[in-house]
Amino acid sequence: MCTTISFAEPEIVLGHGRRVLFVNPDDLQIFKEIELPPDLGLKGLGSQSQESCPAAAAATSTSTATATCAGKEPGGKEQQLTKQPEEGGTTASGSGVTSTSVQNVTYSPDGQLLAVTTSGGQKALLLYRSRPENARLLSTRPLARAASAVRFCSDSSSVLVTDKTGDCYQYDCVELEAPPRLLLGHLSVVYDILWSEDQQHIITCDRDDKIRVTNYPATFDIHSYCLGHREFVSGLALLTDKHIASASGDKTLRVWNYIQGKELLQHELPAPAVRLLVRQLEPEKIFQAAVLFYEHVDALGLYRLERSSDDIWSVTATQLVCAEAGSWSISNFTLTSDRIYVTGAENERLSLRVYDIATGQPATSGVPEGWVKMVLDGLGANEEGAPPFIPEDLSVWFKKRFDNVSDYLERKKRRIEEQQQQKCG
C-alpha cells in the first residue's frame, strides 16, 4: 500500500488506502475528501493503444478499447505493448483478493484537475474536476500496469503516466474518450518525469542511471542525455526553462543544463536519495531542494541552491533534519513555507509527523492538538481491521552487482593450494 502527500497551493493533499484528503495549511482543517468508488468499473475493459496504431482506429472510447499494438517491429510484425489490466476485488481480505488503493495524486498546473492513479486489484487513472465542484469524477481509464510517475502539461490539457516497465503514455484531459498515446519507453522503471513549460521536451529518469530529454511531439527523437549518475535517479525538478535538478542513489544532488546535456553542479549527499522536492524562493535564482535519504541517521536534507549571473550554481546552505529517523519507517514528505510534513509506518500503521522547517524540530505551535489523529482517522488508518501499512522496500532500487573476479581468484587460490599439497604428498 502506498501513501502520497503533496503541497499544491493552497492545500496539502494526502492519499492513503481508498481516500484522498485536502487540508488547509493555515488552519489545518480538512475541507474536502475523495473516496474511491467501490468498483472502478474496469471489468472487461482493456487498456487502450496508441492513437497511431492502425488497430486503434476502431477504438473510439475507453469502454470499447482492447489491448493492441502501438508500433511494428522492423520485419513488419506488430508489437503488443499493452495488456489486459489485472482484475481483482476491492477489499483487503484474506481470500487472496488484492485491494485497490490510491498510488499517486497530482494537481494540474491550473488547479482545476486532479489525476489519481490506483494500484492493486484495479489499476486505473481517475480524472477529477477539483474546483469549483467538490471533486467531481470526470473519467476512469484502465492502466495496463501500475503507474510510477504522473505529470500534467503546462496548459493542463493532457497528463503523462509512466509505468513500472518504463512506458510513458499521454492521456487527453479535454477529449476524455480519446485513446492514450504511447510516447516513449525505457528499458527499466521510470521514477520521475517532467514536461517543460513550452511543452517542447519530456524529461525522464530511470533505474539505469539515465536522464533522458525527449523532443515533443516528435518523441521518436531524443534531444539529449544528462549522464553521470552511477545509481538510480530517483527524482527530478524543473528549475528554469533550461535547468533541472536531480537526486540519485549514488549520494549526489546535481544541476544540469538539460538542453545541452551538461552537468553544472554536483553536490555530495550523506546517503542515497530516494525523494526530491524543490521550492522556488526567488524566481530562477534561489531554490530550496529537499531530499529524503535512504536509511540514514538524518532522514531529510534541505539545500539552498543559488544561481549566479554567469550561470554558476552552488549550494550555499545545508540543513539536516533527523525527523526521528530510526524510530519509524519514513516513506514520503512534503514542504510548505514553514513546515515539513512526513509520513511513514510505525508498528505497521500509518503515521504522520510535522516539523518546523526553520529548526528541523517537531512543530510545537500552529498544529492543533489531536490534528494528526483527525487526519489518520480521515484516511481510515485507525479503523479496526485496516490492512497493515508496510512502505515499499527501496532496497530493490539499487543495482545488484556480482563480483565474478573475486570468485575466480578464490577458486584459483584453492586450486594452487591443492596442487602444492599433491606435490608435497
From Swiss-Prot:
Keywords: Cytoplasm, Developmental protein, Differentiation, Nucleus, Oogenesis, Repeat, Spermatogenesis, tRNA processing, WD repeat. Residues 67-102 are annotated as: Disordered. It is found in: Nucleus; Cytoplasm. In testis, it is present at high level in hub cells, a niche for germline stem cells of testis. Ubiquitously expressed in all testicular cells throughout spermatogenesis. Ubiquitously expressed in all germline and somatic cells of the ovary. Residues 88-102 have a biased composition (Low complexity). Its main location: nucleus. One of its GO terms (cellular component) is cytosol. The keyword Repeat applies. Gene3D superfamilies: YVTN repeat-like/Quinoprotein amine dehydrogenase. HAMAP family: TRM82 (MF_03056). This is tRNA (guanine-N(7)-)-methyltransferase non-catalytic subunit wuho. It comes from Drosophila yakuba.
